[in-house]
Design a protein with these regions (language model features):
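A domain-start/cap signature at the N-terminus of enzymes
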Residues: 31-83
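Surface-exposed acidic, glycine-flexible loop patches that form ligand/cofactor-binding
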Residues: 74-80, 104-107, 174-178
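Short, structurally constrained coil/turn elements
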Residues: 63-65, 108, 179
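N-terminal secretory signal peptides that target proteins for export/translocation
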Residues: 1-11
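Alpha/beta-hydrolase fold nucleophile elbow
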Residues: 177-188
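Bacterial N-terminal signal peptides
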Residues: 18-27
Length: 193
């Protein structure tokens, strides 16, 4: 009996070990500087066999942040319930890494509409804008300034969420058969807040 219990815990221990190693690696990368080299042409510029792309520009209500939003729609007929849709933050970096091989894999199942929400820059990240857009307001005041060497205004996530919900999503989804029960929002680092 003991041997059976031991064998059944071994996979769990292995999974725990691998997840622990992954956590250590990822935590070391938190302190790494992002690669801020200018981006070249992306999949929307090159074209895809599996998706067709469009891009739209938006400005923040206060006019200080400028967004580029790419929409990738599968080249297949929408399911009866509509396409699932995935909004992805850090859209410039997403578009730089998105390729036809991944789009092919997505199109083999129920392909989602992909919406990459980025900024009007040729860099992978607009560090100041994303620090503001992706962070919640401090309880003591509406916006805050991160202190330290790289001071950035923060606390604009409510404004950004309102932009996503009231301007970007309605414009992107206009004319598309979308399954509103299968919407997702993806982000990492600040974008995961």
């Amino acid at each position: 009996m003991y041997a059976r219990e031991y064998r059944s815990t071994r996979p769990h221990k292995a999974i725990f070990f691998h997840l622990s190693c992954l956590t250590l690696i990822c935590s070391a990368q938190v302190y790494a500087k992002p690669d801020m080299r200018p981006l070249g042409p992306n999949i929307a510029d090159k074209g895809s066999v599996f998706y067709h792309f469009s891009a739209t520009s938006f400005d923040s209500v206060d006019g200080t942040r400028h967004y580029r939003v790419w929409t990738a729609v599968p080249n297949t007929t929408a399911p009866a319930s509509g396409y699932p849709i995935l909004y992805m933050l850090d859209g410039n970096a997403v578009m730089d890494r998105l390729d036809d091989e991944l789009l092919k894999q997505l199109s083999e199942k129920t392909p989602p509409v992909i919406v990459a929400v980025g900024y009007q820059t040729n860099l992978p990240f607009d560090l100041n804008s994303r620090a503001y857009d992706y962070t919640p307001a401090a309880e003591s005041r509406k916006t805050d300034l991160h202190s330290g060497r790289f001071s950035r205004k923060s606390g604009g996530s409510n404004n950004f969420r309102q932009l996503l919900e009231t301007r970007i999503a309605p414009k992107v989804e206009q004319g598309l058969n979308i399954d509103r029960q299968r919407r997702g929002l993806w982000g990492h680092s600040y974008g995961g807040l």
